Amino acid sequence: MQHSIVEYLSEHEGYRCGYCGSPDSNFSHGMWAHNLTCQDYQDLIDRGWRRSGKYVYKPTMDKMCCPQYTIRCHAPSLKVKKSQKKVLKKATKFFTTGEKPGGEGGVQHDGEDAPGGVHPMPPSHQELPQMPMEDISKIQGGVQESEGGARVAKGQSDVEGQSDVKGQLDVRVPSEHGGLEGKRAGTSGESPATVSIEKQKRIPKPGLGADPTKPPCKKSKLLRLEKRQERLKQKANTESSEANIRPSNSSKTENSPKSLEEFIVDAIPGQDPKHQLEIKLIRTNPPSQEYINTEKESHKVYEKYQTFVHNDPPDECALFEYKRFLVDSPLVEQYSDDGPECGYGSFHQHYVLDGKIIAVGVIDILPTCVSSVYFYYDPEYRHLTLGTFSALRELAFTRLLNVTAPSLEYYYMGFYVHSCRKMRYKGQFYPSYLLCPEAYIFQPIEDCLPRLDVNKYSRFASEDESDAAVSLEEVLVLHKHIAMPYPVYKQYRPQAADEEEVKEYAQMAGKKCVGQMLLYRN
């Protein structure tokens, strides 16, 4: 089992706000994520966290100048509005005729209101976390659990030197006598030497190969594909049966609103397009070969965008900064039998026009959503209103994934800032929901806006709904390569004056996450 590993960086305060321009009124709490499972990150963004590279931050909503509310849209239920149809039709006309709309060259939803929104840059090298790189390399395999999933072990009680096996961690719990009890997670109590000998006995001799009496084992990718095809077949049969028994209603069909997909067309019917747009999905962590092949080109687009739209100096747009901000990711590449074929994790979507990258959408594909991280484009194509256009295309992509992964049904647009005029367009995607900053429950945006018109910071949930309390006993930490509950860690480091910091981390990360993620302690 893989575990997320994070370092809590506490509160960062007094930095510049990217929305109102105030130099010192932005506040947030942060974590450095060495690695995150996609489920843990899903749980974090459902508590108001977002990532920028490997830096994960949570705005301090009641203190900051421009409160940032997590916003999501239920993609399968999307109702396309007139203004959004206009954006798609304008793009189709351009692809068909090649003509740019007159007088609209400067009108654009730029990167500050593009789906992902404005992010703080990851901490500089002076602020980087303290976890040694050799520790990270030893724990990439994650925590292994014993049978039944219990994090327990027996035997040695000395913390020093217990986890010298690469890719494996001990998981310790308090014994009845107050010490550490447990065996190496995932073993049955034998000594390492005994286990090694037993494993060697099971290894077939060279040259013998697989058992010819048994069929060859199928690869997990093939098994996932077969299960997905079976689900699609069953769904098609169900829809066919429903169609046979459903009474025809031609007038209703004619009057029913068009779906999003019906507005996304490559060219006006009956005309040959002047331009061809292709959207490519490219995994960035671990970097795929296609990402490596296109890294320089996509970085050049980013450089043009940042200098033109945000007036950033060229040295702040260097390849190193670009990768730290939009390529580096803590998300672990994961696959599931009932998930999308592309898997979960971090990706780029390249908008390729006539073989040339004109825009890039940075997205995370998570168990229940597609999360927009950032979007940038070549300013030459700003007339296409690419902020709204990209959001609609990412919504269409979410709807496509939902066909084979029913639990993946939401599109997260980053943050909604009611005080920022350029952000208002996010609320136009219906149905959309804002996250209550106190109860962490999503509420329909139409119920929230009247409250925000009165107060920029507002609770949306009813008073009888509250966030679950978290105790320090529930917090898992990583110390000396060993995962253990926080009270056990305190037995070994009673002098550590970090209790208030860990309490704050637990409250910010929430009950579900602190029992799954490992908080690094040096």
Residue ranges and their predicted role:
Residues 1-19:
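Intrinsically disordered, low-structural-confidence terminal and linker regions
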Residues 349, 404-522:
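C-terminal catalytic domain of photolyase/cryptochrome flavoproteins
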Residues 44, 302, 426:
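A residue-level signal for conserved active-site and pocket-lining positions in enzyme catalytic cores
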Residues 4, 52-66, 71-78, 84-383, ...:
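A conserved beta-strand-loop-helix scaffold within acyl/acetyltransferase catalytic domains
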Residues 349-433:
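Aromatic (often tryptophan-rich) hydrophobic motifs at membrane interfaces
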Residues 15, 27, 39-43, 64-73:
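Intrinsically disordered, low-complexity N-terminal segments that are enriched in acidic
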Residues 11, 23-26, 35-36, 53, ...:
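Terminal, non-catalytic protein-protein interaction segments that mediate quaternary/complex assembly
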Residues 18, 34-37, 46-47, 51:
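Eukaryote-specific detector of the first structured module of a protein
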